[in-house]
């Protein structure tokens, strides 16, 4: 395991053993994927999280800087409140307004990045990251090292109307959680593997997939 991941995992496991956290991060659906919903949980809206922050800073994604495995945008990770102010003071981040933050979120959506909220030991959200599976420490720990306990799924799940689906495969390419596969040119979807990021919704040309609240 890479030292970068090992250091992060040791920190998480220490906090878990002490009962200081129950998970490290949580999936937040993309804004566009929830646009058809008449009512959306406030905690599931990226902009609501940013609006409720006293201050917002943005910095380059530490994971993509470290691993350099893709050409996705770098300056897309938000630090909130005191965490952001501390990073600004050290020259590691810059302050951004809410409109600029919204533009960064839209850019992240376009590049297929996954919104992850990161939590302190006191359960406060201190960062909202826009993550790629090839570099993100939490997504790597979950997918490669089988630590599903670290990343919590969103309260939403993708639902696909088979009658509307044209089996184009774009959602299969988009899904990083292996919830969607092809068999004899037919889409197979395992909703149990869906973590509710919403990326499949925004890429569907037939609008066959929508996000719905999960069953309790």
Pin down the residues of each PLM region:
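Conserved active-site and cofactor/substrate-binding residues in soluble primary-metabolism enzymes
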Residues: 41, 96-99, 166, 195
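General detector of N-terminal leader/presequence modules that precede the first folded domain
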Residues: 1-86
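Ferredoxin-type iron-sulfur electron-transfer modules and their immediate structural context
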Residues: 48, 56-164
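Short, cationic-aromatic polyanion-contact patches
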Residues: 132, 196-197
């Amino acid at each position: 395991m890479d030292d970068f991941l090992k250091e992060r995992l040791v920190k998480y496991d220490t906090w878990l053993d002490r009962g200081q956290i129950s998970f490290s991060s949580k999936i937040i659906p993309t804004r566009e994927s929830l646009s058809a919903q008449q009512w959306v949980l406030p905690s599931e809206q990226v902009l609501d999280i940013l609006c409720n922050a006293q201050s917002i800073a943005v910095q380059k994604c530490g994971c993509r800087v470290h691993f350099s495995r893709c050409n996705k945008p770098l300056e897309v990770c938000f630090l909130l409140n005191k965490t952001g102010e501390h990073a600004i003071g050290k020259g590691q981040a810059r302050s951004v307004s809410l409109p600029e933050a919204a533009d960064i979120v839209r850019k992240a959506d376009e590049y297929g990045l996954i919104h992850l909220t990161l939590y302190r030991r006191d359960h406060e959200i201190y960062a909202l990251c826009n993550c790629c599976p090839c570099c993100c420490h939490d997504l790597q720990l979950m997918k490669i090292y089988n630590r599903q306990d670290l990343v919590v799924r969103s309260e939403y799940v993708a639902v696909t109307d088979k009658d509307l689906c044209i089996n184009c495969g774009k959602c299969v390419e988009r899904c990083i959680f292996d919830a969607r596969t092809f068999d004899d040119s037919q889409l197979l979807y395992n909703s149990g593997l869906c973590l509710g990021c919403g990326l499949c919704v925004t890429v569907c040309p037939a609008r066959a997939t929508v996000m719905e609240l999960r069953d309790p």
